């Protein structure tokens, strides 16, 4: 018996495809203690080479989670930019995801000193 994420990563030939990556970006609806217990983002982070930085984008981030680096995730970014109800967060998810992704892309561009198209 293997973990589901390991099966999926094997089928996708993840190790080979990600071997030269500088960054791996993972996603999670809500990053919480359950996420740290072996859900996809942690499974991916644990299979990522030490040279790659793993970043997580999540719908919401449990403030109790501060040790994600111990699981191989360098930084977590919640897409929620302001207090809002769950209904509003779901309605605004696409806009919030685009905004957060653009901010991360700009950060990577500044760190690398290269253009991102």
State where each predicted segment sits.
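N-terminal loops that bind phosphate or other acidic moieties
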Residues: 1-117
